[in-house]
Amino acid sequence: MKSGFVAALSIVGLVVVLVTAVLLLPGPESAPGATTGSSENAGKESLAAPSLTAIVNVRVFDGESVLESANVLFSDGRISEVGRGIGVPHRASVIDGRGKTLLPGLVDSHVHAIGTAGAEAVEFGVTTLLDMFSMPVNLGQMRDQRQGLAPTARADVFTAGYLATAAGGHGTQYGVPVPTLSSPAEADDWVAARLEEGSDFIKIVIEDGSAFSGSLPTLSRETVDALVESAHRRNTLAVAHVSTYDDAMMAIEAGVDGLVHLFADRQVDTAFIEAAVEAGIFVVPTATVMASAYGGPGTEWLRRHEILAGRLGAMQRQSLAQSFPGSESRASMWANVEFNIGALHDAGIPILAGTDAPNPGTAQGVSIHAELALLVESGLDPVDALRSATLIPTRLFGLGDRGCIRPGCRADLVLIDGNPLEAIEASARVESIWKNGYRVPVQQPESSTAQEQTEGSKASPRPGESVDLLDDPTRWMAAADDYMGGKSSASIDWIRLADSRALQVRADVEQGFAFPYAGAMWNTTGIPMQPADHSGHRRLVLEIDGPGSDYQLMLFSGKAMGAQPIRAPLPVGRESVVEFGEMGGLDLATLRAIGVFATSPSDERRFTITRARLE
């Protein structure tokens, strides 16, 4: 899934994982109430007491319509009264809402809820997550949390659990056993097993890899038909991961309830729109991650919202700084995404906001605000965009008492400083959040002075001792996409040059994986992908010799093993100096590995790393 990239093949199938595959395993977030050290703000559950609260003179968007200058009262986890002129009891804790907008807690309709996803999401007003692929662990605890009204500083999670895919297909590349299907006859038992595990809906993968010049086994039309029929017979939603127009048409014809990615290979036409309208499907475009796949990393949006930067954890900042390999070369296809979103919306097809976090260019929680902005840029008005993250997913996924501000609704609330109903960018100005009626502590942005001091300390570490990476052969290993089910392979040998040691890499890069690669990787410790503090180093000096020009550097860092690598092209035949201060999102205090890879399919090649030094 995504811990690094789960729906990546979906819309992007560019799953860039090397030996980190084991670390990118799709698994649910920590059990409710658990604390973890992978996020600065995770586990902070010192919530305000559940007394009667009144937000007065506030603009209310109830999930469907707008009420100006209203009072909203809530206690014991539920909203009790909403309206103008409602009396406020003396015992109530009163919050002045003048100039502000109260929204229902937001729903992100496509994430991978791994690690501390729930804690990170809620800090930006996302109180419900729809997880599109994770291992079925702790699902009972997750269900208990969302059914109750106990204090929590984590978003509730509804999950697909395992996804339905073919043997060797998308979703099987993460190093964990995934129950696959090979025939329609297996569909009924497969669906029954998922529901027994606790899945809330069924996700079906229709993905042959062609959208990204790859080739993957995928489910037959007959098997997809059988899966949809089995899910519907059990009154369960069936949604589909697609990457192309043809895949989407197949899903619609099979009777799926919704598409959880949009495609960019072509624009929708009359035939597609008519089929979608007749079938009554919904669409989760995942515009944020598609923007990353087609040339727009999440930091571009974040630059317009600098106030949020101080509230982001290191993992979130690092993930936002990334985009998918080769995204710039596909930038022209982004216009198809915008057109398709607008055309589907104009045809009356429900659009749901979903980010596909934590893929490259996205981060839990904060990216929902970028998603809303992209939906508006694609043709939705701000009110419709907000509906896509509140009432619409609540109705279509059967989420019950969420996505609304009415008596009896769950008191999941977000107070915005401004009016996102007129300017959607205002949604990012999250001032206060309530989950189950309890006020959630919100990390306040650092002052600009504090940020400058922090950035300065990182930019000017004490000079570290120079490290020759070629001195210790035990730190090096071959790495290729065959580990992920691809067809590429690599091996390494040590050779002597005139007066030094060099690493010769045999790289056989072949089609058959969304992002083919083969090369070598240096681990900072004797254990692969374990972090070490290199904050005293300022640059990497590297030189490689070999045929071709398609070499790429990848720097792995971050508190969590599944963090996205920082990437940069590498020249051949001359010294390359990589200044770490220019590599946005790199955390030298937790540097894990440095990789050098060939990335274009070709006959077997040999290249040599003649110099590799940290300074």
Briefly describe each language-model feature range.
Residues G118-Q141, R154-Y162, S199-G209, L237, ...:
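Divalent metal-dependent hydrolysis catalytic cores, especially in the metallo-beta-lactamase
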Residues A42-E45, V60-N71, R84, A363, ...:
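Acidic, glycine-enriched loop/beta-strand segments at the rims
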Residues D189-F212, F263-S378, A450:
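Active-site neighborhoods of metal-dependent hydrolases
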Residues G148-D156, A160-L163, P217-A240, G280-P285:
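Alpha-helix-loop-beta-strand connector modules within alpha/beta enzyme cores
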Residues T36-L52, V60, E64-L103:
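Histidine-rich, glycine-flanked metal-binding segment
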Residues E452-E615:
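Beta-rich carbohydrate-recognition modules and glycan-binding surfaces
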Residues P104-I114, G171-D189, L237:
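Active-site mouth loops of central-metabolism enzymes
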